[in-house]
Amino acid sequence: MQKFFLVLSFFLIQTTIFSQSVDLEGKLKAQEEALKEKSKGEEKDTLSTDYYKIFYLDGRIDNVDTTLNIYKDYKFNFLREDSFDLISFANSAHTYNKLAYDFKDFSKPDIGARGKHFHYFEKEDIGYYNVPTPLTEIFAKSTYEQGQILDMLVSINLNPQYNFTIAHKGYKSLGKYINTRSRGNQFRFISNYESKNQLSSWKFHFVSQNIFNQENGGLDPDSIYFFEQASSYFVLDDFGNQIENEDGSFEMIEYDGYLDRSRLSPMLFAEGSLYSKRFFSDFKRVILKGKKDTFNTLALNYQFTHEYKKIQFNDPMNNKMFGEVLDFINDDQNVSDQNRFIEQENRLILSSNSNKLGKIQLSYSLTNWVNNFKIYENQDIGNSVFELNENQSNISFDWKKIFSKYTFELNFNKSSKDSFKSDFISLNIKGSPIKNLNFEIGSSIIEKSPNFNFKFYRSGFESYNWLNDNLHNEKISNINLKLSYKELLVLAADYN
């Protein structure tokens, strides 16, 4: 009996010890799992703004900037860029007086009316996004009087290869003066695709813009006098002479009503607008790619641009400040000029990127322009020209190479015909020999045709009708030097 009790006790003790060890191991494993889950929850998101990329047609790549600094304050305006060299008109979304002139303008001839294009989205201004998470950007600002500006952008990647962006800028401002109201809508749809093997990419955008401004031509002479003399005015007699008091002073009246700008009479009651739609497509295919070095590539691009613009000017009072109206415009009609412009371009680009030679790009483009004007009712056309249809082809060569701390750039373009040409050659050297101190020196020779409105224009005003067949091209030789310290100090000099 004692032996049986001892054996039974031995097995019971062993079973208890074994069960305790199993429970202890289970608790340890549970604690380890809990620690792992806790550590996962405490892991910080390592995603930074460097992953939010913006690509431009010229090859520039920017990161989305979410910092708050003094540079952002310089750009907190209607143009959303540093407007140091611009003097704005009396209301938002109007034109500007430009104090600095860029002599390195390599652009092709356009419709003209550059006063309407300060905040116009050109195809070079469109950025193509690639973001790991949905991105929203909102810019809002009040205007001078009874209005706001809202510019909103939403960018989403459906997958790592495809991104689409929708943006809209809307604004309205009454202004402080009579007949200076402005309003507009600028819609952008942007698409960016790149294949997984990075051999194919496609950039596309559609932009619709509607820019409207009332034009008052400035204040009339009486309004200028009353505004400058406020708030003390001389009292005149029936003959227009000043009334003299007994003490020898002239009688005056106090009235500050003309300090209210909304009561001052303007020179003009007219309206001007710019309406535009543009489709742009850029398809790229890498033909050759180095196995070891991704910089040794050879690629082919096809770019297509179709842009339509319509500029209108309406003067219901047929103001004489522009001269006499044409004979067929009677008292029941008003001047309502309309200019339509279509540009269509096809471009082929062969580009190479190698460590030894740098970036080389050779392109050929064919451009067609159609520029026509409105024909008024009862207008005798006769032999007058109301439409131009022009073609131009261009060959371009671009080279960029980085040597140590210095970057060399060479740009060349040659047009096939003299009319509406845009020939240029430019050499540029950039460098940063000292931290935060940058320099740029360059030279360029440009020969280009003026915009279409210098060569050809039709209007209801007699003095604004011309067709300049023998208009000379503009020739510019330029040497420029630029020194900058961060973005706080910029010194630039040009010799032409």
Q: In which residue ranges do the predicted regions lie?
A:
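Bacterial Sec-dependent N-terminal signal peptides
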Residues: 1-25, 200
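The feature marks either
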Residues: 39, 232-259, 278-282, 293-308, ...
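Outer-membrane beta-barrel initiation region
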Residues: 46, 57-158, 243, 251, ...
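Outer-membrane beta-barrel translocator/channel fold
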Residues: 82-83, 174-186, 190-275, 436-496
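Outer-membrane beta-barrel translocator/receptor signature
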Residues: 130-178, 182-187, 200
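Exposed, low-structure sequence patches enriched in small/polar residues
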Residues: 131-133, 269, 273-317, 331-496
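An acidic- and aromatic-residue-enriched active-site/binding cleft used to recognize and process polar
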Residues: 143, 159, 167-173, 207-209, ...
